[in-house]
Amino acid sequence: MEHYLSLLIRSIFIENLALSFFLGMCTFLAVSKKVKTAMGLGIAVIVVQTVAVPANNLIYNYVLKDGVLVSGLDLSFLSFITFIGVIAALVQILEMALDKYFPALYNALGIFLPLITVNCAIFGGVSFMVQRDYNFVESVVYGVGSGAGWMLAIVAMAGIREKMKYSDVPQGLRGLGITFITAGLMALGFMSFSGISL
């Protein structure tokens, strides 16, 4: 149990996909203007990541891995396209569910919801799962943790950006300029966790 808790904490803080690996920055910067929208997208990323990482773990370990189906048959060269297909299918299911049950959130997320399909944070989480050779339970924990870490980063950024609306930001830095500086300072803050070994 301690190992899984350590993996969860590590994936949220120490190996944060947004602020340590800078994955998913396009949606991170575009949707972080309001906390409510950022929270909705963060929950969507958690759901997709929690399902995509273990689903791709099963597909990789029981279909694509070298010698799993037939001795001497290595289908691992299909892993990228398979992972993207699974992620795309999960995002489509999530999009239909949000459209039916949460139309306000669906409209608020707009074009950024389908962009989760090509969000490199989701694909990065799946790739790290394969690279680190996680088992199924570890992949579930890592999926939840990496999604929660990305959500923590985007909600914190949205909160800071909402407060900056009332700040006296120099003319040349308004908009994305100060947002990039803020993201860099947040990344420095999260870098302080890198010395912790769990």
From Swiss-Prot:
The chain crosses the membrane at residues 11-31, 39-59, 77-97, 110-130, 140-160, 176-196. It is an enzyme of class 7 (translocase). It catalyses: a ubiquinone + n Na(+)(in) + NADH + H(+) = a ubiquinol + n Na(+)(out) + NAD(+). It is a multi-pass membrane protein. GO terms for molecular function: oxidoreductase activity, acting on NAD(P)H, quinone or similar compound as acceptor. It comes from the Bacteria. Keywords: Cell inner membrane, Cell membrane, Ion transport, Membrane, NAD, Sodium, Sodium transport, Translocase, Transmembrane, Transmembrane helix, Transport, Ubiquinone. The keyword Hydrolase does not apply. GO terms for cellular component: Gram-negative-bacterium-type cell wall; plasma membrane. The keyword Oxidoreductase does not apply. InterPro entries: NqrDE/RnfAE, NqrDE/RnfAE_oxidrdctase, NqrE. Its EC number is 7.2.1.1. It is found in: Cell inner membrane. GO terms for biological process: respiratory electron transport chain; sodium ion transport. Belongs to the NqrDE/RnfAE family. NQR complex catalyzes the reduction of ubiquinone-1 to ubiquinol by two successive reactions, coupled with the transport of Na(+) ions from the cytoplasm to the periplasm. NqrA to NqrE are probably involved in the second step, the conversion of ubisemiquinone to ubiquinol. Composed of six subunits; NqrA, NqrB, NqrC, NqrD, NqrE and NqrF. PANTHER family: INTEGRAL MEMBRANE PROTEIN OF SOXR-REDUCING COMPLEX, NA(+)-TRANSLOCATING NADH-QUINONE REDUCTASE SUBUNIT E. This is Na(+)-translocating NADH-quinone reductase subunit E. It comes from Aeromonas salmonicida (strain A449).
